[in-house]
Amino acid sequence: MFISFEGTEGVGKTTLIRKLYEHFEASGKQVVLTREPGGTPLAEQIRSLLLAVNHDEPMSSDTELLLMYAARAQHLQQVIVPALADEKLVLSDRFTDASYAYQCVGRGLSKDKLNTLNQTFVSHMPDITFWLDAPIELGMSRARERGALDRFEQEKVEFFQRVRQGYQQLHELYPERIKRLDATQAPEIVFQEALEHIQALV
């Protein structure tokens, strides 16, 4: 099974993923914990490029999108596809939905570009996706508490409001796959709700 986790900054994805990872490992399931951009040594190098703050040469939106998909292609081929072939449970912090929300709706890039990249490079889609949703101000406050902000975390509130709208659009388009979780709730409640959705699929 392939599960992805989406949301804007500071909504608690990492906490939920860790809880699910510990739960399924304890039950004897082979679990692969991964993330995007990243997940392989090469993809992690691309992640560093994407998150680095560079005032001398700002990254264009097209470059950002292409780097995301370069990392994604490597991640799929090296981690996700082999793990699924071995019938392991894959938990991925972000996947293709993030590119729609951040690069298409957030940055204003053409959906045709995204569709072409998906058709060309994305061989597998998640069985279920959890969208952790919370007010932007709450998430940004949590992100600031973690310390230095990366290039995305430094974006303005208006950008993240568009990203959140992008996730809402996806949730409405694919309600069977994308499940909204209220990330303002206690982490344990969010975990239990996610677990119920997963168990309903098994």
Curated annotation (Swiss-Prot):
Gene3D superfamilies the UniProt entry points to: P-loop containing nucleotide triphosphate hydrolases
Uppermost EC category: transferase
Binding site for ATP: G7, T8, E9, G10, V11, G12, K13, T14
Record keywords: ATP-binding, Kinase, Nucleotide biosynthesis, Nucleotide-binding, Transferase
Gene Ontology CC terms, in alphabetical order: cytosol
Catalytic activity, reaction form: dTMP + ATP = dTDP + ADP
InterPro entries reported in the protein's UniProt record: P-loop_NTPase, Thymidylate_kin-like_dom, Thymidylate_kinase
EC number of this enzyme: 2.7.4.9
Family from the record: Belongs to the thymidylate kinase family.
Function summary: Phosphorylation of dTMP to form dTDP in both de novo and salvage pathways of dTTP synthesis.
Protein's name in the database: Thymidylate kinase
